[in-house]
């Protein structure tokens, strides 16, 4: 690896994230080259199995268990009480999906057999009090939501993804015009 790189970007899941963090430190890169990455690299489901090698890693994701909002605090507290662990992106996503579905079903008074009405309700509802913050769907059915920049820190003896910045209302197109963006050719190897 060239010595003048600004950072290493890692997007890993599960065991691979654990191994990578250890190897990053063992190879002497921690403290010398910034580590940035996708949120699953340091998700709360793997943090309990990591040590100080993860401290300082900066990742981006639409959820952090340490998000300081009333909705997330209530969710994280209830989750921890029931499952004896910190909620992860995966558990929060399932919870949010469930709240979304309930809101849509309520919006159509339970008429789930009316497929068109259910799909329209799923596209148009905006459930409140989601742990991750506000979410809505764009015209293409993809989420517009906050993306949190998180840094791994040790707080009260536990590793956590501390939110250090927020990009509000991020869509699949980021800052690009959707019409222009969709005219581009598909990615291909």
Locations of the language-model features?
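Extracytosolic ligand-binding ectodomains
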Residues: 1-189
């Amino acid at each position: 690896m060239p010595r003048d790189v600004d950072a290493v970007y890692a997007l890993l899941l599960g065991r691979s994230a654990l191994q990578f963090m250890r190897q990053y430190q063992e190879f002497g890169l921690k403290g010398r080259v910034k580590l940035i990455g996708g949120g699953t690299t340091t998700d709360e489901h793997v943090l309990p199995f990591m040590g100080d090698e993860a401290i300082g890693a900066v990742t981006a994701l639409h959820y952090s268990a340490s998000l300081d909002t009333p909705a997330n605090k209530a969710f994280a507290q209830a989750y921890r009480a029931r499952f004896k662990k910190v909620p992860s992106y995966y558990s929060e996503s399932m919870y949010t999906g469930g709240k979304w579905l309930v809101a849509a079903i309520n919006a159509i008074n339970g008429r789930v057999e009316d497929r068109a009405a259910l799909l329209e309700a799923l596209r148009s509802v905006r459930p409140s009090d989601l742990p991750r913050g506000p979410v809505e769907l764009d015209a293409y059915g993809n989420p517009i939501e906050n993306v949190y920049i998180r840094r791994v820190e040790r707080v009260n003896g536990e590793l956590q993804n501390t939110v250090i910045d927020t990009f509000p209302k991020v869509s699949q197109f980021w800052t690009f015009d959707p019409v222009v963006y969709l005219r581009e050719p598909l990615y291909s190897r």
